[in-house]
Amino acid sequence: MRRGMLSIGLALLFVIGAYAPLFHQPQSASNIIVDSKIGDFSASQIPTSTVFSPSQEYWSEQEIAEPMVLTRDLRALHAWQIAHGLLPEQAPGNLQDVSISTGIVEHRRVTMPGFLVPKLAGVEGVFAVFEDRTGPEPVGALPGEPNSVKSGQIHGAVDAWDRGYNGSGVRVAVADSGIDFAHPDLNGTQAVLDDPNSPYDGWGIMHDPISLVRWQRDGLAYPAAGNSWWVDTTSVDVDTNNDSILDNQGWDINGAPLSVSGVYHFGEHSDSRLIQRAGGNVHILVIDTQVAGVYDTILIDIDRDGDFGDESSVNQSNPTYGRDTNGDGLWDQSAGLLWWISDGINGVPYGDIYAARNGYQNRVAGAGDLILLMLNDASEAGGNHGTLCASAVAAQGVISNGAVLGMAPGAELIAVSNLYAGGSWLDSFRFISEGYDGNASTSHDQGQIGSFSFGNSAAHDDGADYWSLYLDWLTRVHSPETTYFVAVGNGGHGYGTTASPGGAHGVISVGAFSSKGSTWGESASWSNRGPNSVSRLDPDIVAVGWSATGDRTLNEVTNANNARTTWSGTSLSTPIAAGLAAVMYQAWNNATGAWPDSQT
């Protein structure tokens, strides 16, 4: 009963907070302006009680605590942290001030002495304090069977393709372990930012929470930060005698694009599977090919012969790279996707928004000192799960005579990666709904559809847990232009088994149905189901979840045509449903001239 009342109270506070206008003020501890009116509610009408879970007594007993704080006034919380010396430590560097929001629901994890946690109830705008204890886990890619199903035919996607609807123009964010965009089935499917006013215009729309926190907090990238996919390229070399041999490294650059400044930056590739396949460290050159000091191109010595002249340029126009080892015209090794090169002026994409939300300043790398790679390193947390999910949405049917074809081959994929390696779910939820500019009201840089093949089965109050409530608020109030498809999980049998956040009210929960034998069309026995703690029956829909083909990462195999498998689970059902939704989005837009929202 007590848990139910807490959930009701938290939901009410979310709703009230939803009517607060968004406005930014300069970051300053001494100049905090709080509007006496928040939307249609006066300050005196807004509940001042703060929900604590666990109790205040629990927090007080902790020597050091790391609660997740939800607030309508992040500036007030930021100022309180300054007053108590509780802002997170940040390594020195070129750091820029950021604007802290007020009047909008925000989240922040705060590290603090336990005895101070109850004091958060007195901070303006704070309405919930939670224990952010368990991270997401992939709901599981169950092994498939040799004879895979034809999902496109079963769901009628093939008929839609014949009518010209393939998800074109629809951005689908796959939040998972990463995407191998150099895979022939996924090459060219990445979403690209179209915003001439943005410094990231023309680059891919991506998010890597682990690499981002290692950069903003510690000022580190690979190899100093071993769990980062971003590469430190501060090391430099020159060719002073113009003999096409770099003076210090001895690398051959004959035939490579020339550096206008004469200064070549370099670093080491961060994909451990590529390093294993290639037989050692794979070096990268960063070159300013057009304007001195404006680094626009990288070369990857993927064959490790010390000759960069035989490698193709990787840049904004050609962001993926790989190696064809058997001459069949398909890349068999993947070097991933390049999604930004530091310019010495701007921070990394989404860096300012992340910094403000988490209490940091925005770190700016020198020109050519940092490159951002999107990978799916199958040796790391989550394995190849992200690439499998991405292929269910948008695989192009290139390898193995078209063995893998996504439901929406025209869709544009946003990779929200490294999800199982740590960090906060909420940061990734928020990125999908807001994009690089942190603004949910714009429509050019965020996901229209989010695909979540993960969950937390440890949440026994699924639907009323704070992850579910936060996601419900995001999709129904803060950013209704984003629809989330969320797996219910594979933990059946029985009722009341839906994994969080699949039980959230505003999302579309996805279960699996059987596509074999006498149980064809029935919900799979292992597919989770409701009712949950907020009386949702779950799942909302079911999709193929049994023995479909999917793409593996290239660096797991030696031949691109073998970079596939068969798999099962609600991890499969969810991106299939998301891909089908992308097809319907395109048809809706064609018929009405507008995009549907999450509640349409």
Where on the chain are the PLM-derived regions?
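Extracellular S/T/G-rich loop segment that most often corresponds to the catalytic His/Ser-adjacent loop
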Residues: 344-346, 354-364, 499-586
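Secretory targeting signatures
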Residues: 1-29
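Hydrophobic, small-residue-rich alpha-helical packing segments that form membrane-like cores
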Residues: 425-440, 452, 459, 464-467, ...
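Active-site glycine-centered loops adjacent to acidic/histidine catalytic or metal-binding residues
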Residues: 176, 471, 489, 569
